[in-house]
């Protein structure tokens, strides 16, 4: 029987982007939830290039006496998942919990995730109950979940919920992956041997607005498709092959009909022209698909730019500068 590693310290990573209204309540409730764990803990708040007072508020909270807050300040906005990866690079805990800053997933759920991870799970996911989102957000989330499940074969119910817990070896494995487009729940599940989901409460957003606009959701879907699989490129080749075969079949049929019914039936070769045109269009799609396959692989290999740049890390009694945190 595999021995379950004990959890001595819990790290909570929270990406923050223009959340100055919710920060005081977020810090208070997250700290209170962590105090109930009976374990050592730290709370890493990653400012993802906020344009409001979020960064200065995080720095002040981190410098307070007795604070468990670590403020990780990025130089600009890199997106939710890259901000979380920046936080991962500075965690010191055995179990890492991720949480959104909007308080729609209550921090009070953290002890439940830690208790479930204590049972030996590598990844503890969550499923939002009675989601307090718009109809469009719910439908988009359901579509994305189905896309991920069909592509990865992992039957997880709610990939969009970022309230999750990961064992330290899962975090270390993800940090060794250097692709620029990262979707953390999917990446974590590729390394997890044991994963489980538990239901959690979902509240209405009290402060500000959602940072995921319609276009950002569309971009997220494209990122998911391109970072998960090269199937769309292969489907392009398949589609081109089908068109080419149909064009060739039509050409043969037209030749037979011309022989059987004479040249008048073939409209002076117009139908034959279309048949040949379909053949060439199909061949072009096949060629484009093959080129796309190679370009996609080259693109995957050369994506070596940093996912984020940490400008400053502020914790109780210490401040590190950007020179120490280039990623």
From Swiss-Prot:
Keyword Lyase among record annotations: no
GO BP terms in the entry: 4-amino-4-deoxy-alpha-L-arabinopyranosyl undecaprenyl phosphate biosynthetic process; lipid A biosynthetic process; lipopolysaccharide biosynthetic process; response to antibiotic
Enzyme Commission number(s): 2.4.2.53
Highest taxon in the source lineage: Bacteria
GO molecular function: phosphotransferase activity, for other substituted phosphate groups; undecaprenyl-phosphate 4-deoxy-4-formamido-L-arabinose transferase activity
Residue intervals passing through the bilayer: 236-256, 270-290
Recorded topology in the membrane: Multi-pass membrane protein
InterPro entries associated with the record: ArnC_tfrase, Glyco_trans_2-like, Glycosyltransferase_2, Nucleotide-diphossugar_trans
Location(s), subcellular: Cell inner membrane
Associated pathway: Glycolipid biosynthesis; 4-amino-4-deoxy-alpha-L-arabinose undecaprenyl phosphate biosynthesis; 4-amino-4-deoxy-alpha-L-arabinose undecaprenyl phosphate from UDP-4-deoxy-4-formamido-beta-L-arabinose and undecaprenyl phosphate: step 1/2; Bacterial outer membrane biogenesis; lipopolysaccharide biosynthesis
Keyword entries, A-Z: Antibiotic resistance, Cell inner membrane, Cell membrane, Glycosyltransferase, Lipid A biosynthesis, Lipid biosynthesis, Lipid metabolism, Lipopolysaccharide biosynthesis, Membrane, Transferase, Transmembrane, Transmembrane helix
N-terminal signal peptide: none
Reactions mediated catalytically: UDP-4-deoxy-4-formamido-beta-L-arabinose + di-trans,octa-cis-undecaprenyl phosphate = 4-deoxy-4-formamido-alpha-L-arabinopyranosyl di-trans,octa-cis-undecaprenyl phosphate + UDP
UniProt-listed Pfam families: Glycos_transf_2
CDD domains noted in UniProt: DPM1_like_bac (cd04187)
Function: Catalyzes the transfer of 4-deoxy-4-formamido-L-arabinose from UDP to undecaprenyl phosphate. The modified arabinose is attached to lipid A and is required for resistance to polymyxin and cationic antimicrobial peptides.
Protein name in UniProt: Undecaprenyl-phosphate 4-deoxy-4-formamido-L-arabinose transferase
Organism the protein comes from: Enterobacter sp. (strain 638)
Gene that specifies this protein: arnC
